[in-house]
């Protein structure tokens, strides 16, 4: 299997932030990496306040109850990547930004390569995870929630999805980001989604199809513990040398523009 052609990556750890800012930072890193200004980057971050991120192709009006989100104090933001809705709260989120020329291959291949870093990370935490090869067929079909079925090469434990990820490409650069959840909060998630079936039943189904670190480890890990495992897992599995560094001034300026003009605006979040 082909590993990344560039071994020297930047590790960026940013504090919890609103959803619009988080998505803006990921895009700013993509733009700056495309220009050759910054190296391939592994970013680790959190969300404050909690947020629901919507897949790029989802309909906000059809799938998310915005008023329920407001009552819960939960932001809503559309991701630049596909997939379904995710509740971001008790978790660590990762993003990887790397030029396609430095990680050649189609989406499935690159997804598998990056999943090896995630697999090594959760195994460092003592979790006996595996890569899902063929998605299982579950009764009832998928819902608007991201974690209801594992996709190919996503992490699962005992047949239950643990880490959900999504990938997009632009300007010759791969952006993949995903969630390592401490607590699924299935009931809370379905309170904020527009669904036709019984919310309690959907939450129970999700808990049968997905899991979280709290259940796998028998305790809730610290954010720092999981961040350390992710950095070590990616470095070890992909043969990387990670150098901790902050976002550049240019990335910060561009992220502020994108958060204000794009990810924080109705024209982006309500576009479908």
Feature map (PLM): residue ranges:
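Active-site-proximal flexible loops/turns
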Residues: 33, 90, 161
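Gly/Ser/Thr-rich beta-alpha loop segments that engage phosphate groups in nucleotides
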Residues: 57, 84-85, 166
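Short connector loops at helix/strand junctions that flank enzyme active sites
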Residues: 47-49, 71, 87-91, 150, ...
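Extended cationic-aromatic binding surfaces that line active-site or macromolecule-binding grooves
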Residues: 47-60, 93, 97-98, 113-120
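A glycine-rich, hydrophobic loop/mini-helix early in the fold
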Residues: 63-104
């Amino acid at each position: 299997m082909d590993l990344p052609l560039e071994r020297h990556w930047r590790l960026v750890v940013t504090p919890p932030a609103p959803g619009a800012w988080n998505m803006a930072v990921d895009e700013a890193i993509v733009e700056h990496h495309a220009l050759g200004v910054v190296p391939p980057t592994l970013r680790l971050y959190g969300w404050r306040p909690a947020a629901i991120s919507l897949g790029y192709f989802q309909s906000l009006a059809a799938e998310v109850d915005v008023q329920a989100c407001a009552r819960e104090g939960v932001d809503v933001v559309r991701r630049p990547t596909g997939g379904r809705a995710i509740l971001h709260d008790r978790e660590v989120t990762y993003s990887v930004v790397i030029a396609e020329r430095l990680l050649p291959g189609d989406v499935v291949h690159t997804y598998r390569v990056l999943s090896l870093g995630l697999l090594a990370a959760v195994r460092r935490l003592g979790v006996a995870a595996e890569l899902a090869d063929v998605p299982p067929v579950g009764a009832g079909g998928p819902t608007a929630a991201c974690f209801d079925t594992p996709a190919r090469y996503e992490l699962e434990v005992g047949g239950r999805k643990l880490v959900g990820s999504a990938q997009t490409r632009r300007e010759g650069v791969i952006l993949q980001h995903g969630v390592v959840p401490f607590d699924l909060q299935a009931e809370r998630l379905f309170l904020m989604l527009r669904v036709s079936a019984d919310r309690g039943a959907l939450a129970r189904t999700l808990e049968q199809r997905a899991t979280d670190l709290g259940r796998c480890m028998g305790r809730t890990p610290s954010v720092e513990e999981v961040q350390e495992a992710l950095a070590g897992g990616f470095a070890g599995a992909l043969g990387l040398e990670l150098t901790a560094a902050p976002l550049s001034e240019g990335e910060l300026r561009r992220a502020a523009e994108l958060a204000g003009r794009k990810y924080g605006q109705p024209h982006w979040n309500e576009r479908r």
